[in-house]
Amino acid sequence: TLPFGFRWSNRLIPLGTHEAAKHIRRQQLQWFKKRKGAGAWVQEMVSKSNASQPKPDDELWLDQDARAMAVDAGEAASENASGSVRFCFYTQVMVVMDPDPVRASYVASEILKALNDAGFTGRIETVNALDAYLGSLPGHGYPNLRRPLISTRNIADLLPVTSVWPGLANNPCSFFPPKSPPLMWPATDGATPFRFNLHDSDVGHTLVLGRTGSGKSVLLAMIAAQFRRYPDAQVFVFDVGYSMWTLAKAAGATHYDLAAGRPDSLRFQPLAQLDRPSERAWAVEWLETLLALQGVSVTSVIRAKLERAIELIAVNDPAHRTLTELTAQLQNATLSSAIRPYAVGGNYGQLLDAASDDLQEGRFQVFEMKHLLALDDKVAVPVLLYLFHRIEQRLDGSPTLIEIDEAWMALMHSLFGARINQWLLTLRKQNAAVVLATQSPSQLAQLSNRHTVVDSCPTRIYLPNPDAATPAQESLYRDLGLNDREISIIQGATAKRHYYVKSSAGSRLFELGLGPVALSFLATPSGSSMEETRRHLEALIALHGDDWPAVWLEERGHAAWARQFRQHHKSREDIQDEIQVA
């Protein structure tokens, strides 16, 4: 692709068999006459005057190219007569428009250079420029007499039947408001813009494959930030390694550090809504999972005891719908001892036996799972199943994005894998898109349900991988539907810069094109770890409060943007004050 715009016009004037035969015959005769130059004619006259026989050296006086072209014209006449191909007048014109004549001349010369490098000939029109332009317009068959006669076989090779995929101008999901804009406009090579959407029709499930250090976290953060452009959008992110922490704090999201072991760590009350019949059914299923994790086989008798105990505590005040109350109502030593680790005083009581739930109702929520995933399944599974359930409760038809980083770890687990599979199959109808990110195709290949995952994610984003063409990796990429050219693109792409997206609508290599201000909130600063950055920003938040983003921008050398942030923040406060006064 070329880094400027132009219009490429292709004009075909088809000819009938008899009309084409006349033009081919004329061309053949012209080439036949050109086969002998002046020297050949003189040599022939001398030979005739001496009545001598032709000599082998006489062939040297002939124009071999003209003779070959005459033979080629004869073959064209045979093909035309047989009807195996048709012949047409064909004209290619590339129209360059620019208010600056110098710029237009430069662009035209660059296009001609690119054509010559590809083995084509061309010229920049001068006297014939007007006719060439008119001939490029629909319905103008006569202007521009530069129209060589070629066969349909050649035309099939020359016609630009493919083009760079520009993406869809609007979000294609029918559940979104009409004419919703694309998710973002990434940077690309050439002049053709690219409009990026997660959705393929009304399915927004997306698979992201990228090795560590290739730019996956920045991409996920950018997608989460951009998704909030849609009215009433909800974003839920399951993060690993605090890569979304800075964005969450700056964007006003609620960030939960699960099982961090701090005094202010997040605590849940899974049984708080037992006054609802649907919640009681879910609670029984959830408690059965807890019992199974503790080695208790759930029978119909045990299920009946659980249901009875849940009915008893459902009438309590919300603050008393806890696991501690449940163990008291069970009146069964085996069941009580199995649930006691999750109650107050147990190993996991600080997470799952609160008198009130710390989980809020914000529209942008980030769950940091680094510490939780380091714990035993006996605690990680109940917590994540509860979070999944709460997210499902929030699905009200609003545009919803659910991002799961390091998704292969969740997919490898039978319970999580089954739940995510269910999401992939059903959440489309609730206007929710699931983005699954993992490090490599080899991790995906280990999943027993990989075909369901791949088939349910019509949009796939591949990050650079210099080993993509190795035998071990190539077969995995081919299983995902990539061809040689696409694997080569992924192999040659630059880490932390390029992303290759493929869907049923098209494919494109793109860049996020982020400036230093955006990267201040989406990426870890060079030379610092995420942990160091987080500690520093926590200190800024404690010292400056809501003004910390401006201070952070000033530290990064973006004073003008810091002033703009403060002006915008003050304007919002003034508007809120006016609303309160009114």
Descriptions of predicted regions:
Residues 20, 120, 134-194, 245-253, ...:
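P-loop NTPase motor domains
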Residues 93-103, 212-214, 371-373, 408:
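A generic structural motif
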Residues 241, 437-441, 464-467:
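A short beta-strand-to-loop transition that corresponds to the Sensor-1 phosphate-sensing loop
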Residues 478-537:
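Conserved P-loop NTPase
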